[in-house]
C-alpha cells in the first residue's frame, strides 16, 4: 500500500497580488484552508511550505504542520519547497498544490492517485494545452534529482521534468474539470474567478 502525502506551496508575499495569496478569502474561508480541506480528506498526511514572512499567519488558519524551506535552499522556488516537504514527510508519492488554485476538488486527487504507477517518476496534468507541474504527483525517488538540480542552481520545474519518466495526462481524458485548476495571480483574476464560480 503506497503512502500518499500532500505538499502545499504557500509561498510568501505576492508582488503581483499585493498580499499573500494563501490568505486571500475564498467562499467563506481562505485559499489555503480550502485547499487543505480538500487535500486532508484525500491524502494521508499534508504539510504546508511557507515563507518566513507569513508562516505565523498561515499557522493561525491551518491544522497541519507549516514549515519553511530547508535553510540551504531557502527561496529557491518550487523545487526547494517540494524537496523540503519530501524531507519532512516520508511517503511513496507526493501530490503538489500551489496556494493559488483555490477551486481544486477532492476528485482531482482521486484521479491523480489512480494515474500513478511504479514505472513513472511523475504524473503531470495538461490543462487547456498547458503542462501543470505544480498540480502534479511526484514519486519519492525524484528527491535526489531535485537535490542535484538545486546544487547546480537549476530551479525550474521544466528541468526536473526533463530528467523524469513523466506520465502526462490530458485533463479532458480523465474527466478533470478545467475550473479546478483556475489559477489566481492578480487581483483581476481573483475578481474574475469569484464571478465565474458564483455564476455556476
Swiss-Prot record:
Its main location: cytoplasm. Pfam families: NTP_transf_3. Mg(2+) binds at residue 100. It catalyses: Mo-molybdopterin + GTP + H(+) = Mo-molybdopterin guanine dinucleotide + diphosphate. SUPFAM superfamilies: Nucleotide-diphospho-sugar transferases. GO terms for molecular function: GTP binding; metal ion binding; molybdenum cofactor guanylyltransferase activity. Its cofactor is Mg(2+). Keywords: Cytoplasm, GTP-binding, Magnesium, Metal-binding, Molybdenum cofactor biosynthesis, Nucleotide-binding, Transferase. GO terms for cellular component: cytoplasm. PANTHER family: MOLYBDENUM COFACTOR GUANYLYLTRANSFERASE. Transfers a GMP moiety from GTP to Mo-molybdopterin (Mo-MPT) cofactor (Moco or molybdenum cofactor) to form Mo-molybdopterin guanine dinucleotide (Mo-MGD) cofactor. This is Probable molybdenum cofactor guanylyltransferase. The gene is mobA.
Amino acid at each position: 500500500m503506497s503512502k500518499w502525502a500532500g505538499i502545499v506551496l504557500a509561498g510568501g508575499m505576492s508582488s503581483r497580488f499585493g498580499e499573500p495569496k494563501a490568505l486571500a478569502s475564498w467562499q467563506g474561508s481562505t485559499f489555503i484552508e480550502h485547499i487543505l480541506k480538500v487535500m486532508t480528506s484525500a491524502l494521508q498526511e499534508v504539510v504546508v511550505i511557507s515563507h518566513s514572512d507569513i508562516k505565523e499567519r498561515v499557522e493561525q488558519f491551518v491544522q497541519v504542520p507549516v514549515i519553511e524551506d530547508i535553510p540551504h535552499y531557502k527561496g529557491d522556488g518550487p523545487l526547494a519547497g517540494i524537496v523540503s516537504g519530501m524531507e519532512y514527510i516520508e511517503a511513496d508519492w507526493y501530490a503538489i498544490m500551489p496556494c493559488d488554485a483555490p477551486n481544486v476538488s477532492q476528485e482531482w486527487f482521486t484521479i491523480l492517485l489512480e494515474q500513478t504507477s511504479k514505472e513513472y517518476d511523475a504524473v503531470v496534468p495538461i490543462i487547456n494545452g498547458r503542462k501543470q507541474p505544480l498540480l502534479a504527483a511526484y514519486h519519492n525517488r525524484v528527491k535526489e534529482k531535485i537535490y542535484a538540480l538545486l546544487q547546480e542552481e537549476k530551479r525550474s520545474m521544466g528541468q526536473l521534468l526533463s530528467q523524469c519518466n513523466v506520465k502526462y495526462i490530458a485533463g479532458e481524458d480523465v474527466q478533470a474539470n478545467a475550473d479546478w485548476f483556475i489559477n489566481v495571480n492578480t487581483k483581476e483574476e481573483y475578481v474574475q474567478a469569484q464571478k465565474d464560480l458564483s455564476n455556476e
